[in-house]
Amino acid sequence: MKRDSSFWWVQGPGWLLFVYLIYAQAIPAFDYDIGVAMGTQESAQQITAVGVAFWYGFAFADLLIYIPFLALGLVAHWSGKMWGRVLLGAALGITVYWPVVCLAAVVAARDATGWNLENEMEYWMVLPLITLWGAWSLWRITR
């Protein structure tokens, strides 16, 4: 496999995202309140109990599916294995999808009773970049 700059633009941010997901999603999947204390999850006072359930659902699914797919896909992609492209492609599909879902939920919930998200701008600064990187990386590994 040719390790040109685009290879590194898949691998580098991919591993950064992996580390972020362990910290921000895997830990709260075991104890959501720890995620709130760490600042990686929103409290029920900010997003309601339904919002917490929604965010927890993402954390749990990330722990079971997304994080393992991303890690195994990146390792196999690094090794030049064909199945790595398939697994990484699945993880990148999730990478493109979940930020869009989260941003749509943030917009749809703006006027909902009990929804008091203090700093929506953080979502708008980070999530579109993750989506763009995921889409570009998906394109890169399939060409």
Describe each model-derived feature in a short phrase.
Residues 1-143:
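Topology signature of small-to-medium multi-pass alpha-helical membrane proteins
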